[in-house]
């Protein structure tokens, strides 16, 4: 029963709401860069396209095939990525990895919404 309660906490109302409201879904016609990643643990797949101007992301699109946690993460990223530099995005990525893998603090603004994923650190396959 305790494990079930923990799983319910993991898939909180906030995570489910973020997953349901994912912005920038689709693809761009002429992106400056594209990337696709697949998780070997769970099979989630994320493909992104970006257009950059003057060193900042001006357009962003994503196709996400993932569980609610992956969709919530994609939602937080997409809500905050326009206007950011590649360095800001890389810093948020590194801070998120540290939070999930070694108990570090959540990423700083504007990506502080990733804090909602902190409970996932207890579930290595997530």
Identify the function of each model-found stretch.
Residues 69-70:
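Hydrophobic alpha-helical segments that drive targeting, anchoring, or assembly
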Residues 46-47, 78-79, 88-91:
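Short, surface-exposed, polar/charged, turn-prone segments marking secondary-structure boundaries
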Residues 73-85:
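Alpha-helical support elements that line or immediately flank enzyme active sites
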């Amino acid at each position: 029963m305790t494990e079930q309660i923990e799983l319910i906490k993991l898939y909180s109302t906030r995570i489910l709401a973020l997953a349901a409201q994912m912005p920038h879904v689709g693809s761009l016609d002429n992106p400056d860069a594209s990337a696709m990643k697949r998780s070997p643990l769970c099979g989630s797949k994320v493909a992104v396209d970006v257009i950059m101007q003057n060193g900042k992301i001006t357009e962003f699109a994503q196709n996400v095939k993932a569980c609610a946690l992956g969709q919530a993460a994609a939602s937080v990223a997409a809500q905050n990525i326009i206007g950011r530099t590649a360095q800001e995005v890389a810093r948020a990525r590194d801070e998120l990895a540290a939070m999930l893998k070694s108990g570090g603090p959540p990423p700083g603004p504007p990506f502080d919404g990733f804090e909602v994923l902190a409970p996932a650190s207890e579930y290595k396959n997530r």
